[in-house]
Each structure stands twice: as structure tokens, then as C-alpha cells.
Amino acid sequence: MKKILLIVLLLNFMCLAQELVIGEERVEPGIVFIFEGAVKDHIMPMGMHLDEDQTHIHIEARVNWDEINIPEGTPRGGFVPYLHITAIVKNQKTGLQTFIDLLPHINLVDNFHYARNISLPGGIDDLYSVTFNIVPPTHIDLALHKDWLNSYGEALLKGQSFSYKSVYFGEICRARRN
């Protein structure tokens, strides 16, 4: 009976795990990036986003302060706003690629995150290379106080680029939201 219960619980957990972690990175001064492929979703306002039925996946970057070794006064695990994040998804078989601007989103699962519903540039069972580019906020987007300047310099963080190869989105493409 215990084995059956364990199997049922495991299957339920697997059904609920509808996000593919593409990569995780930590950059100074204590910012954690979690890049994911998630199940596509209905996103508003509709005039700024593709219809759910025209896309394959919801590509996202969860960007939060770490829990440790972060600047004084920083909310542990809090969302990091004002970043400009793009992604390039390239089909490894055909070379076709798509460029995406990830925009701030909010939901009841991840709360604030950067994301976009996208159509893959090829088949859902193809392998893809994914590159995420992070551009820090401009001086128009974010003003810095003297204490930050003295401790961390003239930017929130340095520009970053993270690349991942052989990403398989097939399972996420076939999954549906509850």
C-alpha cells in the first residue's frame, strides 16, 4: 500500500512540474537568474502578446535577490526590476532562430518574472540553443544613491549573457495548464 501511495504522489508531482529549468546563474551583487521553458498561457493585454494558440512555450527568466550575501537593505528573494532581458532561441538542426524581448509578468505561481509566449523556430521535438542576454537598467530607468555608488559602482549589475545547448522543449509544448 505504501508503494502505491508513493507512486501516486510521484505521478501527481510530475504532472504539476510544468516548467523546464534551462539554467540557473548567480551574479554579483547577489542576483539569481533561473531560466525556464514553461507551459504557454493566456497573457494580457492581448494586443501586446501572441495568442496562446499561436505559440508553443512560455519562455521566462525568474530574477530575484539571493537569500544570502546580498547588499544591505535588500529584500531576500525579492524580484529584481528594471532589467532588459532578451533571448535568442536557435534550432540546432536548421539554424533558424527567433529573437524575444522578455517583459515583466506577474502570476500566482512565480509572482513577478520576465517572460513571453513564443513559437519555436522549428519542430517541438527539435533541440535548441538558447541565449539569454541581460542588460542592466539605464540611468533613466534606475537612479542610484551615493551609498550604492560607493559600495557597488555605477550600475545595478554588469551586462551578462548565458547560453545553453541541446534544450528539449517537447514535453513542455505538449503540456497544458490546469
Each language-model region and where it sits:
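Short amphipathic, basic-aromatic surface patches that mediate peripheral association
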Residues: 57-78
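Solvent-exposed serine/threonine-rich low-complexity stretches and specific carbohydrate-binding patches
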Residues: 98-108
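Sec-dependent N-terminal signal peptides
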Residues: 3-16
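Short, compositionally biased P/S/T/A/G/V-rich stretches that sit at domain boundaries
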Residues: 18-53
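Aromatic sugar-binding surface patches on proteins
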Residues: 108-117
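Extended low-complexity, serine/threonine- and proline-enriched intrinsically disordered segments
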Residues: 77-97
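Compositionally biased low-complexity segments at domain edges in trafficked proteins
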Residues: 160-178
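Short acidic/polar inter-strand loop motif in beta-rich domains
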Residues: 134-149
